[in-house]
């Protein structure tokens, strides 16, 4: 579960390495974000020459969480780190590649483009 002030890794090649959650989108009572939710982030660490700069504010969709997700068959998928993919104003991925695995639950949230860019879909 991701809340305000949580630090996440970036799973795409947009140039950002670490980001901090500054707002969870989805209503006034939405305090934590889960897999597939959209959050507003601030870039805390970026590589030189990347598409994004330190201090920039973007939206991002969460693709991996430590708490994981429970599937209807009862199985649970958890990851070692929290990660997200940065989105532009039109809710399209900024990067052209997604590193690491993503889950099938993103398809239900209408993020098929992220699934097609990912190395592996679990």
Swiss-Prot record:
One of its GO terms (molecular function) is structural constituent of ribosome. It comes from the Bacteria. GO terms for cellular component: cytosolic large ribosomal subunit. Keywords: Ribonucleoprotein, Ribosomal protein, RNA-binding, rRNA-binding. The keyword rRNA-binding applies. GO terms for biological process: translation. InterPro entries: Ribosomal_uL14 (IPR000218), Ribosomal_uL14_bac-type (IPR005745), Ribosomal_uL14_CS (IPR019972), Ribosomal_uL14_sf (IPR036853). Binds to 23S rRNA. Forms part of two intersubunit bridges in the 70S ribosome. Part of the 50S ribosomal subunit. Forms a cluster with proteins L3 and L19. In the 70S ribosome, L14 and L19 interact and together make contacts with the 16S rRNA in bridges B5 and B8. Belongs to the universal ribosomal protein uL14 family. This is Large ribosomal subunit protein uL14. It comes from Rickettsia canadensis (strain McKiel). The gene is rplN.
């Amino acid at each position: 579960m991701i809340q305000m002030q949580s630090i996440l890794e970036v799973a795409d090649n947009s140039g950002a390495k670490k980001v901090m959650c500054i707002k969870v989108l989805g209503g006034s009572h939405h305090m934590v974000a889960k897999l597939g939710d959209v959050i507003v982030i601030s870039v805390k660490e970026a590589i030189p020459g990347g598409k994004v700069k330190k201090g920039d504010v973007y939206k991002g969709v969460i693709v991996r969480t430590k708490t994981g997700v429970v599937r209807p068959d009862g199985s649970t998928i958890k990851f070692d780190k929290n990660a997200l993919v940065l989105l532009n104003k039109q809710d399209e991925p900024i990067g052209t590649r997604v590193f690491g695995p993503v889950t099938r639950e993103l398809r239900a949230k209408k993020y098929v483009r992220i699934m097609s860019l990912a190395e592996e879909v679990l």
